[in-house]
């Protein structure tokens, strides 16, 4: 129903986009046992904490610059095949350090994958460097400093992800100040595992242009109005929210209510194979589960381009492709 529509994705974690087939091949290549995390082509986890553990274990099978080029190229090729014109990938240089590859080689591999994919299909992509809450404020500050000093034109944003229940946003203000001063776009995970207060905290402390998820703002109607008045863009990932039991079903999900309240919303897939989804499915759900028509879905895609962390020339070119 939505296969003909142009698509844009603002919220996808790179390692979280790794297909089970590619991960299995990588595990065989390195002789790594991931049977506790991947069985019969399905990633195995049971709650948010175990999902993060599964994610980290799966990430261990991607070890070299070429591994990351392949992972990135494979996902962007998949996106291009469903009419996607732009993707922002959330990446963690800290992961490159932890596996002994190093942040520079990790990012270099990802950038090579972006170049390969663009050469084939014309898909544009940018990188959002993220700090992980569960590694603590100093680690997050390090990620911000890396992004700020990298001087890489493909690194255009900074994010805070990970275990949302660890610390308040105020603990990470310095990291966002570093990123802001470097001219990076700011987005932050909030209003997913934690309630509306986490969205308010993010607005108060960080003043981000965008919020990853943010859907639980619906629990505070004054906050919803504030989001609408500010023009803050929500990177909404309905399939992820259902998989993580933020909401029991799509009928309960507030995507439509947020949009009708004037909040600027977009559609993304988060960690697609972990949540049995894809960007293609998320767009189809917008039509089938939420009842949006083509024009409404195109409007959300336009919002995503308007909110993308890109230079104005690229933004104009993307808007012209809609």
From Swiss-Prot:
Query: Which Pfam families does the entry mention?
Result: A_deaminase
Q: How is the cofactor bound?
A: Binds 1 zinc ion per subunit.
Q: Which UniProt keywords apply?
A: Hydrolase, Metal-binding, Nucleotide metabolism, Zinc
Annotated residues that bind Zn(2+) are located at: 11, 13, 189, 270
Q: Which EC number applies? A: 3.5.4.2
Catalytic center at which residues? 192 (proton donor)
Q: What is this protein called?
A: Adenine deaminase
């Amino acid at each position: 129903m939505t296969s003909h529509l142009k698509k844009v994705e603002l919220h996808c974690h790179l390692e979280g986009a790794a297909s089970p087939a590619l991960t299995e091949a990588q595990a065989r290549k390195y002789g790594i046992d991931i049977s506790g995390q991947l069985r019969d082509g399905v990633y195995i986890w049971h709650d948010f904490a175990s999902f993060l553990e599964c994610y980290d274990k799966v990430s261990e099978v991607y070890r070299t610059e070429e591994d990351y080029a392949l992972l990135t190229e494979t996902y962007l090729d998949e996106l291009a095949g469903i009419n996607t014109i732009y993707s922002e990938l959330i990446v963690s240089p800290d992961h490159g350090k932890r596996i002994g590859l190093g942040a520079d080689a990790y990012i270099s591999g990802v950038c090579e994958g972006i170049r390969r994919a663009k050469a084939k299909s014309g898909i544009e992509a940018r990188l959002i460097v993220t700090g992980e809450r569960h590694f603590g404020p100093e680690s997050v500050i390090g990620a911000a400093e890396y992004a700020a000093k990298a001087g890489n034109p493909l690194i255009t944003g900074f994010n805070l992800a990970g275990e949302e229940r660890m610390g308040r946003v105020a603990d990470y203000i310095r990291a966002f100040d570093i990123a802001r001063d470097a001219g990076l776009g700011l987005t932050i995970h909030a209003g997913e595992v934690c309630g509306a207060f986490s969205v308010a905290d993010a607005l108060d402390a960080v003043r981000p242009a965008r919020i990853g998820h943010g859907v639980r703002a619906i629990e505070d109607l004054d906050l919803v109005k504030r989001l609408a008045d500010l023009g803050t863009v929500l990177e909404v990932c309905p399939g992820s929210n259902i998989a993580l039991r933020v909401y029991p079903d799509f009928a309960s999900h507030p995507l439509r209510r947020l949009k009708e309240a004037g909040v600027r919303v977009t559609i993304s897939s988060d960690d697609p194979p972990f949540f049995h989804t894809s960007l293609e499915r998320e767009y189809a759900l917008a039509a089938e589960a939420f009842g949006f028509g083509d024009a409404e879905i195109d409007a959300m895609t336009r919002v995503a381009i308007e909110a993308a962390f890109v230079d104005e020339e690229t933004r104009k070119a993307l808007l012209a492709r809609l």
